[in-house]
Amino acid sequence: MVSQPAPSESSPYLEIAKKEKIKIDFRPFIHVEGVDNKELRTQKIDLSHFTGIIFTSKNAVDHYFRLAEEMRFAVPDTMRYICQSEAIANYLQKHIVYRKRKISFGEKNFADLLPLFKKFPSEKYLLPSSDVLSPDITKTLDTANVDWTRAIMYRTVCSDLTDINIDDYDMLIFFSPQGIKSLQQNFPNFKQETTKIGVFGNTTLAAAEEAGIKVDLMAPTKETPSMTMALEKYIKSLHK
């Protein structure tokens, strides 16, 4: 089982399933719930006080503009947008007229944004985020020495998985520490035994190990930068 939503028809997961004659089920172990404007106000956040916004995900984009609308805040055309990736920057078009706006983006990792913060150091930045924030983000922003404020605009919560028989699966694949938490919350009596566990990212690995779970498959690595590559390599190793 892959703890993500079902992918499109062209997904590498579906290609692996067909090629290796295995069955892959998709089920998100976590989901996002937005905070309301009342809760945002308790964080002492006034959207009009900021001249720049830092977006690290599409969820952050959606919930920022949702709350802006709820609070009747008209986002000014002069707002500067710093996006972690080009995909997130392009996603802004869902909410704003992209042309003529002050939009910049990095390659992939948050640390890649450091030159942009040095280029635009005088903005007062708002960071819309979930209740879980990577320490890399805090470290990069503090290194950049810019004026920034975090606003928790949505929360990552455990989904209800009680309709699943978790023991039916030979392998479970996780992409976040919250996914591991959801496993424990939904299946408090889960015993790993012969169940193989795959994880993506060091923080997910750490969460699994902390929960006493043995990890059999890890990505990204130099050889397997994606989970699908790691999974295919693992399956092929079983045939040897």
Feature map (PLM): residue ranges:
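Conserved beta-alpha
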Residues: 1-240
